[in-house]
Amino acid sequence: MQLFAFGVNHHTAPLDIREHVAFSEESMQHALHDLVGHQLVKEAAIVSTCNRTEIYCNTDTPDKAVGWLADFHHLRFGDLEPYLYRLLREQAVKHAFRVASGLDSMVLGEPQILGQMKNAVKSAEQAGTLGLLLHKMFQRTFFVAKEVRTSTEIGACSVSMAAASARLAERIFGNISEQKVLFIGAGEMIELCAAHFVARHPVHVTVANRTVERAEALARRFNAHPISLGELPDQLALHDIVVTSTASPLPILGKGMLERAIKQRKHRPVFIVDLAVPRDVEAEVAELDDVFLYYVDDLADIVKEGLDNRQGAVTQAETIIESNVVDFMHWVATRQSVPTIRALRNQAERYRRHELARAHKLLAKGEDPEKVLESLSSGLTNKFLHLPSSVLNHATDDEREQLIELVNRLYQLHHS
């Protein structure tokens, strides 16, 4: 078995590919059970965010594991294959460390990915698909991420996706304080966005969510008006700015709904940021003249602001990561000797029990205890040394030299 990571992210695949391989919260447990249930992998954890879907696993059949991703999402492997990355052993470990530290994010140094990876581990634990190897790797991953964030300035002055959404809205409207804002969803991303937009004092804020109770909870925090998703067709036209990020597998806003809203607004423009993967807004909406539609990938230029000033922090972070990769792979290597050590100890225990039982019988017959102890010790010595001696004596000339060197090292022999 070996560590293996594979998937797609914003570096390798466009949004229309990423949304087809995303896993919803509801499908995660089924996906993990399906992957491990097919005995393609021994362990597995799935990280699925707006920017990446990647699978960390312990497997002897990497190619079959990769093929599972396409099969699970009912895709042709040939359509997905050009966008996939595959990382084995130390490269998989290094990738996990970089992702958790925010070095692989669209927003360099952003902290949200660490929480998302922790959620992925929690899901794998609940599904029973997290074994010793992945558990240890993720433990070290979270340790490294903490060290990178506390020892470097990697997160300093970073522009989050939420902040970028607000900045982009300001570029369109100039002043958000004169606009009405609608948030669709009530998860972490919407909560972050709401904080940035509300800080700019919009005229009115509405929160729409499938579960009205969650909309009400978020609305109370930001002095907003809660509504259900069913009210969107009537409410959409009242808002100038729409920010959406739900876990819906199907679009929330279609072209027809936006056309009706624009007509009601007498063609006053609407600014929409869709941070969801899969997308909440149909791609055809971009064809409407009075809609400024931005998807998550469209925010890349804004979130890269200030990147040049943090290159020193990136170098420091990479050094920390490289050191920890070496340490972790050393631990993995030592694990390979565990079965042999266990077998050796079990063999020794069998010898001990056999000789001890023999000694008890001799004592029961009234044999001299000193002679019994002598027999016990010589019996153990002979049993321990018989096989190594036999292997050395029957080895070929080429084998013998290596075996002699190995025995000298194992037993720390010094020839006088």
Swiss-Prot record:
PROSITE patterns registered for this protein in UniProt: GLUTR
Keyword Cytoplasm: no
One MF term in the entry's GO annotations: glutamyl-tRNA reductase activity
Keywords: NADP, Oxidoreductase, Porphyrin biosynthesis
Binding site for substrate: 49-52, 105, 110-112, 116
Catalyzed chemical reaction(s): (S)-4-amino-5-oxopentanoate + tRNA(Glu) + NADP(+) = L-glutamyl-tRNA(Glu) + NADPH + H(+)
CDD domains: NAD_bind_Glutamyl_tRNA_reduct
Site (described: Important for activity): 95
GO BP field: protoporphyrinogen IX biosynthetic process from glutamate
Signal peptide positions on this chain: none
EC supergroup of this enzyme: oxidoreductase
Top-level taxon: Bacteria
EC number, as in UniProt: 1.2.1.70
Quaternary structure annotation from Swiss-Prot or TrEMBL: Homodimer.
Domain notes: Possesses an unusual extended V-shaped dimeric structure with each monomer consisting of three distinct domains arranged along a curved 'spinal' alpha-helix. The N-terminal catalytic domain specifically recognizes the glutamate moiety of the substrate. The second domain is the NADPH-binding domain, and the third C-terminal domain is responsible for dimerization.
Family the UniProt entry places it in: Belongs to the glutamyl-tRNA reductase family.
Remarks, miscellaneous: During catalysis, the active site Cys acts as a nucleophile attacking the alpha-carbonyl group of tRNA-bound glutamate with the formation of a thioester intermediate between enzyme and glutamate, and the concomitant release of tRNA(Glu). The thioester intermediate is finally reduced by direct hydride transfer from NADPH, to form the product GSA.
Biological role stated in the UniProt entry: Catalyzes the NADPH-dependent reduction of glutamyl-tRNA(Glu) to glutamate 1-semialdehyde (GSA).
HAMAP family: Glu_tRNA_reductase (MF_00087)
UniProt protein name: Glutamyl-tRNA reductase
Organism: Nitrosomonas europaea (strain ATCC 19718 / CIP 103999 / KCTC 2705 / NBRC 14298)
